[in-house]
């Protein structure tokens, strides 16, 4: 049976089984009841299920929040950024030191929705305008490798979060950035903003007339930066309606912040313009806060973060006001890693992670993650490795389903671990898989993380094995493959076996490769700088 046929059968059987399980649960509770209690049993079945709210943030570094993701590392947070609501959530919930995602937005969103790794789903790169992605792009025709195509939309037979939860009585909404093509309404979401990408969130650009240049300054009358206020109002309305109707709900608020295209309220910006550390930056870089381009202004980025925090707070306040705080899980997490220069505004702070978005070094895939909910110990920290494709089985588990019945997924439920269960060796050493067989400022490469160890394979330079020990070297400064050949070989073989098993696509050697063309490309310097290395790598200026 081929992969596509298997997926169709799995989804059909899964949805059918979910409906039967949901029905059996209701009937089981009311088997000896009167007609009236049978009717009420359905309400009880819904009422005892927790609500789930996922606040999904765009392009946010692991250390891009004021919440330390590692208490032993000053560089794991950004103290200049004020986000009191996020900090309160961290005090009341659980932080995840080792949370991982995909290196880019669209693939990450597919992982969240389907519980599948990117090599399994075939969705390995973001949705741009190129069709098919990169293979026909002249920019890459003389590069060392021919990067493969990627799936362009969700497999119609993949089970999404909304589809998995619906048979368990849930109503689901997805607001904000979708960026997976296809209509969220066809994936189980009753309320959504359509097949959105980055563009709606860049409001200053999205509302331009043809030929009109993008504003370099924030308008004085900006009231809905990154649509974060209007998205939040929709989210609040959805929660109010579901509570009124007695429905458990799944709400995903996929914010356009903190993606570039910096937008914020002017009054919030003024606060950071006048911050002593930002003032020092203006002076050092000979910039005037009254004329600086908004894309270069650290005050704009910091203010965008604080405005976002206000919208997070509005959601948390409404949850409390509705009386559902004790029965609602709230998750805040980023879609991919990043590298924010604003960290360096604080004297003494340097970048703790290697590389950034588009790379499988930790700077591209390690993300901030905080979860609050019933059974989660306030102020706790989880240090096991978790990944974005764990969300679907976790949410399904919270909703009363059996995550073991979910087929063709790679994630596992984290529910028991959040409730205090100590992870065993099997969990701590499980394999996490990452696959980015494309060019950007990066190069085609794949990675596996297993416990403390990480192997990265660069397809254009396969003779340089990469192994790092993240427990001792979070900045991935030392390649220890030569000293540990057996560990490297074991993990490399497991990664390549997995990629083959799930039908992953690979880049190919380019017979038309022209070294001079590749060398002259403006992004090749970074590709070399952050490519494979032996022994100790050279530190970047913002790490020294």
Pin down the residues of each PLM region.
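Short, surface-exposed beta-strand/loop micro-motifs that present aromatic residues
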Residues: 162, 444-449, 453-457
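Short active-site alpha-helical segment characteristic of glycosyltransferases
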Residues: 161, 177, 391, 414
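N-terminal export signals
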Residues: 2, 13-33
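Conserved S-adenosyl-L-methionine
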Residues: 95-100, 176
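Active-site nucleophile/metal-coordination loop of metallo-enzymes that catalyze phosphate/sulfate
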Residues: 91, 100-125
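His/Cys-centered metal/cofactor-coordination and adjacent catalytic loops
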Residues: 72-78, 119-161
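Residue-level detector of anion-binding/catalytic polar loops
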Residues: 95, 171, 318, 454
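Active-site-proximal cap/lid insertion segments
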Residues: 38-50, 57-80, 88, 101-104, ...
């Amino acid at each position: 049976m081929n992969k596509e046929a298997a997926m169709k059968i799995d989804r059909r059987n899964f949805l059918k089984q979910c409906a039967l399980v949901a029905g059996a649960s209701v009937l089981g509770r009311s088997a000896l009841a009167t007609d009236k209690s049978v009717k009420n049993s359905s309400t009880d079945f819904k009422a005892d299920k927790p609500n789930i709210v996922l606040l999904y943030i765009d392009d946010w570094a692991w250390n891009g929040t004021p919440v330390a993701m590692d208490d032993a590392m000053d560089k794991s947070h950004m103290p200049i950024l004020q986000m009191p609501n996020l900090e309160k959530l961290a005090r009341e919930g659980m932080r995840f030191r080792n949370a991982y995602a995909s290196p880019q937005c669209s693939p990450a969103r597919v992982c969240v929705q389907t519980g599948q790794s990117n090599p399994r789903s075939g969705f390995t790169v973001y949705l741009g305008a190129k069709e098919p992605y990169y293979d026909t792009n002249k920019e890459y025709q003389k590069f060392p490798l021919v990067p493969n195509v990627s799936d362009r939309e969700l497999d119609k037979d993949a089970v999404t979060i909304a589809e998995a939860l619906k048979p368990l009585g849930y109503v689901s909404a997805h607001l904000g950035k979708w960026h997976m093509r296809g209509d969220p309404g066809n994936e189980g979401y009753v309320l959504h903003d359509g097949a959105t990408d980055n563009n709606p969130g860049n409001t200053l650009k999205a509302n331009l007339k043809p030929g009109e240049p993008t504003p370099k300054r924030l308008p004085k009358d900006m009231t809905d930066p990154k649509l974060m206020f209007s998205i939040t109002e929709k989210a609040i309305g959805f929660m109010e309606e579901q509570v009124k109707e007695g429905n458990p709900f799944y709400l995903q608020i996929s914010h356009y912040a903190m993606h570039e295209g910096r937008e914020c309220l002017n009054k919030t910006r003024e606060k950071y313009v006048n911050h002593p550390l930002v003032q020092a930056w203006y002076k050092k870089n000979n910039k005037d806060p009254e004329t600086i381009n908004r894309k270069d202004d650290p005050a704009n980025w910091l203010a965008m973060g604080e405005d976002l925090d206000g919208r997070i707070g509005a959601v948390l306040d409404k949850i409390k006001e509705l009386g559902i705080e004790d029965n609602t899980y709230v998750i805040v997490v980023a879609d991919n890693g990043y590298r924010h220069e604003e960290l360096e505004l604080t004297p003494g702070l340097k970048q703790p992670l290697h590389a950034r978005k588009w790379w499988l070094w930790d700077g591209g895939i390690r993300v901030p993650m905080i979860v609050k909910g019933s059974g989660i110990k306030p102020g706790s920290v989880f240090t096991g490795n978790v990944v974005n494709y764990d969300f679907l089985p976790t949410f399904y588990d919270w909703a009363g389903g059996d995550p073991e019945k979910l087929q063709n997924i790679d994630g596992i439920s984290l529910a028991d671990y959040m409730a205090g269960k100590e992870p065993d060796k099997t969990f701590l050493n499980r394999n996490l898989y990452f696959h980015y067989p494309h060019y950007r400022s990066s190069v085609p490469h794949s990675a596996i993380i297993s416990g403390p160890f990480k192997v990265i394979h660069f397809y254009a330079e396969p003779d340089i094995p990469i192994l790092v020990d993240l427990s001792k070297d979070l900045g991935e400064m030392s390649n220890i493959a030569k000293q540990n050949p057996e560990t490297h070989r074991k993990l490399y073989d497991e990664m390549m076996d997995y990629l083959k098993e799930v039908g992953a696509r690979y880049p190919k050697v380019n017979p038309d490769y022209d070294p001079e063309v590749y060398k002259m490309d403006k992004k090749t310097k970074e590709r070399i700088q952050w490519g494979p290395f032996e022994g100790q790598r050279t530190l970047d200026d913002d790490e020294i």
